[in-house]
Amino acid sequence: MRTLWIVAVCLIGVEGSLLEFGKMILEETGKLAIPSYSSYGCYCGWGGKGTPKDATDRCCFVHDCCYGNLPDCNPKSDRYKYKRVNGAIVCEKGTSCENRICECDKAAAICFRQNLNTYSKKYMLYPDFLCKGELRC
């Protein structure tokens, strides 16, 4: 399922906050969100279940939980704006949903940077069937 989503994103482009999130990831880590984080471990990419494979995957787990706390928002499509001030990500004022989505994405991008040393290519394109259990935030 995740692979299908990745192909769809590549074919139709990325809209909404996914575009901003990808930009944040690149700025913080020097890595392109696709393919580096689009299907990494059990939580990076669409959906998630099981135990995070490493600290990088845990960043995605926390990010999924953050989005889960925004039931009235559309994190994949609602656009927000941010800027950098002295190298730091600053979410610009928007709607309540835009602000909260931006803060979730900001935390994940920073988490990825802080855990670059745990990033392992063996978890890129990680198969879903190896991830067992439910998401428990």
From Swiss-Prot:
It catalyses: a 1,2-diacyl-sn-glycero-3-phosphocholine + H2O = a 1-acyl-sn-glycero-3-phosphocholine + a fatty acid + H(+). Ca(2+) binds at residues 43, 45, 47, 64. GO terms for cellular component: extracellular region. It comes from the Eukaryota. Expressed by the venom gland. Keywords: Disulfide bond, Hydrolase, Lipid degradation, Lipid metabolism, Metal-binding, Neurotoxin, Secreted, Signal, Toxin. Residues 1-16 form the signal peptide. InterPro entries: PLipase_A2, PLipase_A2_Asp_AS, PLipase_A2_dom, PLipase_A2_dom_sf, PLipase_A2_His_AS. Binds 1 Ca(2+) ion. The active site is at residues 63, 105. Disulfide bonds join 42-131, 44-60, 59-111, 65-137, 66-104, 73-97, 91-102. One of its GO terms (biological process) is phospholipid metabolic process. SMART domains: PA2c. It is found in: Secreted. Its cofactor is Ca(2+). CDD domains: PLA2c. One of its GO terms (molecular function) is phospholipid binding. Its EC number is 3.1.1.4. It is an enzyme of class 3 (hydrolase). Snake venom phospholipase A2 (PLA2) that is neurotoxic. PLA2 catalyzes the calcium-dependent hydrolysis of the 2-acyl groups in 3-sn-phosphoglycerides. Belongs to the phospholipase A2 family. Group II subfamily. D49 sub-subfamily. This is Basic phospholipase A2 DsM-S1. It comes from Daboia siamensis (Eastern Russel's viper). The lineage of its organism: Eukaryota, Metazoa, Chordata, Craniata, Vertebrata.
